[in-house]
């Protein structure tokens, strides 16, 4: 139903579907992976009572910035996507959208996100420039370093810091525990994602943690996920979170254990499904935080 609704927008403009695909609106998994930790941080910053305006600002902000990030990512990869099986049908790779149009879409989406940030406060506005810089540089990192997933983690975690400044006007040191936890988690699940393209990436010279980790990939991913949960436990203690939060962490831990088992043969599609599965871990933690505050 969701895809049918998106495709119906072609009635408004014959190329609407091409731009929606460029913004990856047909694949909302990236929205979920960015949204859950952002909302977790917002709920904690607001002690379980975030304003509706902040919830809307950060929810729509996540959608816009993730879409913009996809546009600039495809711009950066436009010359290599056609050589990778999973990406050879992307709009830039097939010529349905031009490089100039992709840059314009990136600018429009980031501009719209910035208008939302202007509804917060000066500190959050200044922080938003860091988010823009990370979003713009991440797609190019895979040409120069084996750690592009770390840059993605930094970008995907930036909204956590912004929720605290938007809510309270300041950034407590403990918020960095949530930031580090999400960065570690992101590196883990995006390594699963990179494992789906590892053979193609080796041929075309694209770098990733999946290539760097080699045969230790799954063990390192599980270690990163465990460290992420450890940081969340520490943050939970600092923010006085209790049983429901810990239950959410337990469900997330079960998700991580299942992913480790499921990818034991490193099948490409299984690695991709493990990447998608991380959405449920993030949702479990968010629900745990919401219930922990709501049922006090």
Swiss-Prot record:
The protein's Enzyme Commission number: 2.5.1.39
Family that this chain belongs to: Belongs to the UbiA prenyltransferase family.
Reactions catalysed: all-trans-octaprenyl diphosphate + 4-hydroxybenzoate = 4-hydroxy-3-(all-trans-octaprenyl)benzoate + diphosphate
Cell compartments where the protein resides: Cell inner membrane
Name the UniProt record assigns to this protein: 4-hydroxybenzoate octaprenyltransferase
Molecular function terms, GO-annotated: 4-hydroxybenzoate polyprenyltransferase activity
Ranges that cross the membrane: 28-48, 52-72, 102-122, 146-166, 169-189, 219-239, 241-261, 275-295
GO cellular component, one term: plasma membrane
Predominant cellular place of this UniProt entry's protein: membrane
Pathway: Cofactor biosynthesis; ubiquinone biosynthesis
Keywords, in A-Z order: Cell inner membrane, Cell membrane, Magnesium, Membrane, Transferase, Transmembrane, Transmembrane helix, Ubiquinone biosynthesis
Function: Catalyzes the prenylation of para-hydroxybenzoate (PHB) with an all-trans polyprenyl group. Mediates the second step in the final reaction sequence of ubiquinone-8 (UQ-8) biosynthesis, which is the condensation of the polyisoprenoid side chain with PHB, generating the first membrane-bound Q intermediate 3-octaprenyl-4-hydroxybenzoate.
CDD domains listed in its UniProt record: PT_UbiA_COQ2
Single Gene Ontology BP annotation: ubiquinone biosynthetic process
Bilayer topology: Multi-pass membrane protein
Chain segments annotated as coiled-coil in the UniProt record: none
């Amino acid at each position: 139903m969701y895809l049918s609704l998106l495709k119906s927008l072609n009635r408004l403009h014959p190329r609407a579907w091409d731009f929606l695909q460029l913004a990856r609106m047909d694949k909302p998994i990236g929205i979920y992976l960015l949204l859950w930790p952002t909302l977790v941080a917002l709920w904690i910053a607001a002690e379980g009572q975030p304003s509706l305006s902040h919830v809307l600002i950060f929810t729509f902000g996540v959608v816009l910035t993730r879409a913009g990030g996809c546009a600039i990512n495809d711009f950066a990869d436009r010359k290599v996507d056609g050589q990778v099986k999973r990406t050879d049908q992307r709009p830039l790779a097939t010529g349905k959208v031009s490089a100039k149009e992709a840059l314009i879409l990136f600018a429009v989406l980031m501009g719209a996100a910035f208008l939302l940030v202007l509804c917060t406060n000066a500190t959050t506005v200044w922080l938003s420039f860091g988010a823009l810089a990370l979003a713009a540089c991440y797609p190019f990192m895979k040409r120069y370093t084996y750690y592009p997933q770390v840059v993605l983690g930094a970008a995907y975690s930036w909204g956590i810091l912004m929720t605290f400044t938007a809510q309270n006007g300041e950034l407590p040191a403990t918020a960095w525990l949530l930031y580090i936890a999400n960065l570690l988690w992101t590196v883990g699940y995006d390594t699963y994602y990179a494992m789906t393209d590892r053979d193609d990436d080796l041929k075309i010279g694209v770098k990733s943690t999946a290539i760097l980790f080699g045969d230790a990939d799954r063990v390192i991913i599980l270690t990163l996920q465990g460290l992420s949960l450890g940081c969340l436990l520490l943050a939970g203690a600092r923010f006085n979170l209790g049983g429901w939060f810990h239950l959410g962490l337990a469900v997330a831990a079960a998700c991580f254990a299942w992913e480790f088992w499921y990818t034991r043969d490193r099948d490409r599609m299984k690695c991709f499904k493990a990447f998608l599965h991380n959405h449920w871990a993030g949702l479990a933690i968010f629900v745990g935080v919401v219930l922990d505050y709501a049922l006090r």
